[in-house]
């Protein structure tokens, strides 16, 4: 495995992790919003 390929795979993994964090954050925000709306209805 060449050095360039290795650094590329690390950058790719970091990008995937960043995307996963964004998706998780969006899901949590959505759940908070739903909980807030349910409280308003009750």
Swiss-Prot record:
Q: Which UniProt keywords apply?
A: Membrane, Transmembrane, Transmembrane helix
Q: Which family does it belong to?
A: Belongs to the DinQ family.
Q: What is its main location?
A: membrane
User: Gene for this protein?
Assistant: dinQ
The name this protein goes by in its record: Uncharacterized protein DinQ
Q: Which residues cross the membrane?
A: 21-41
Q: What is the membrane topology listed in the Swiss-Prot or TrEMBL record?
A: Single-pass membrane protein
Q: Where in the cell is it found?
A: Membrane
> Which residue positions does the secretion signal occupy?
none
Q: Name one GO cellular component term.
A: membrane
């Amino acid at each position: 495995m060449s050095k360039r390929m290795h650094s590329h795979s690390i950058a790719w993994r970091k990008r995937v992790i960043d995307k996963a964090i964004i998706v998780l954050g969006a899901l949590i925000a959505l759940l908070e919003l739903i909980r807030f709306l349910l409280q308003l209805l009750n």
